[in-house]
Amino acid sequence: MIYLFILFALIAGMALPTQFSINAQLRSLVGSPILASTISFIVGSIALLILSLFQQGVRFNKGWLEGPWWIFTGGLLGAFYVVATIVLIPRIGAASTVAFILTGQIIASVLIDHFGLFGVQIQSINLYKFIGVSLIIIGVIFVQKH
């Protein structure tokens, strides 16, 4: 079963640079990274709304409003992420954009795990994680070399 999750993660990972490149072309068509991001989010939101309508047992609950304020900021971070990729792809290319984003994701993930931020179970930084992050950063440097 774990292999299916790994495959799912790999496919999701491959979807991101594809989305980035498609959104960069959309920006060229509409002339604005913000408008391209808006269109991308509207299309994605419609797809999610349709999926939500068919999901069993999930309904609006006013208890949702009792969570911490930051729990609803994921969409803002997603919007920043999409705009950033639309701006970066034409300037530094897909490989460099993904390499730098991946580096940022790994660094943030290790810090979130280490400090238990956002309710994540604490997983301290160890030598293996440090070496792994270092190798990713070295890989980004190699991706940048022409």
Question: What residues fall within each predicted segment?
Answer:
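Hydrophobic alpha-helical transmembrane segments of multi-pass membrane transport proteins
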Residues: I11-T18, I22, W69-I92, I138, ...
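Hydrophobic/small/kink-forming positions within alpha-helical transmembrane segments
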Residues: P17, L49, A79, V83, ...
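Hydrophobic/aromatic residues within transmembrane alpha-helices
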Residues: A36, L88, F115-L117
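Juxtamembrane boundary at the C-terminal end of a transmembrane helix
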Residues: H114, V143-H146
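C-terminal transmembrane-helix exit sites in multi-pass transporters
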Residues: I107-L127
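Hydrophobic transmembrane alpha-helices of multi-pass small-molecule transport proteins
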Residues: N126-Q144
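Structural motif at transmembrane-helix junctions in multi-pass transporters
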Residues: S28-S32, A84-F100
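Membrane-interface interhelical linkers
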Residues: M1-I11, T18, Q25-S28, I34, ...
